[in-house]
Amino acid sequence: MSVKVMTHDNMFVGMKEVDHYLAPSDYEDESESELFYESYYSDDIFEDNESDLWVDHEDDPWIEQLDDPVKTPKIIKPYPWMTSPTKSVDKAAQKEKKMPDWWTKPTTVTPTRNEQGILNYSLLLPPSTKKPTQPNKRRKNGGAKPPNSKPLGNPAKPNGVSQQQQGPKRDSTQQPTRLCKSVLKQAKCYFGAQCGYAHRYSDLKECSYGKNCKKIVLVRVNQDGTLHLANKPGAVCNFKHTNEAQQSYLARLPQSTASPKNPRKK
């Protein structure tokens, strides 16, 4: 098989026909021409479609090409567990409602609810009801309290005697057993009548055993008739005894005149 082409010489030089691919002047040997065809027309090109090239399809049965099926729209049905049942026209009558514009909408916030730019939601709650108060079971029902017969206002003070100088009035069970530091230091007590210590020696509580107390020993009797007592070894009586001298009481029970130091402060 040879291919004849029209070269440049054919057009302008006597219309000379040249067998371009099989011209003897182009290839010295036939082996070169065979190599040329093998390189450009190899069998690898026809490997994939070799079966189609050499098979005659004239005897194959006729397959009718059908048109594309008509697509019908899919109807989505609501699930009974997911949506509410449909309502009839009578039960759910549709009314044409025109949505109001922003300039025709009524104000939903009343001026009473708006307090300094903050909505007062407590006005929307139901009114509070007062709970019935139950009587106190611990309190005894002994009747009403008697009216206070004391006159209002400050009572009249005695002539020239203040409450601090007079001293607090205590029962025998509430009498102090120690002297105040202001008496020992000869200073002013800032607590006044509310002080829990005695401001006078006569205000101290006496021993309930008296002469039968087994923790003291009589040392001597002073010229003024007062007694000078002392504690027995291994025993201390913290109370004042009758006719005991003040010096005897202070010697037997030394009073602390200094406040205890705070160990944290240096």
UniProtKB/Swiss-Prot annotation:
Stretch list, region Disordered: 84-176
Similarity-based family: Belongs to the IIV-6 077L family.
Biased composition (Polar residues): 105-119, 160-176
An example Gene Ontology molecular-function term: zinc ion binding
Regions of compositional bias (Basic and acidic residues) in chain numbering: 88-100
Entry protein name: Putative zinc finger protein 034R
C3H1-type zinc-finger residues: 180-192
Pfam families: Zn_finger_prot
Taxonomic placement: Viruses, Varidnaviria, Bamfordvirae, Nucleocytoviricota, Megaviricetes
Key words, A-Z: Metal-binding, Zinc, Zinc-finger
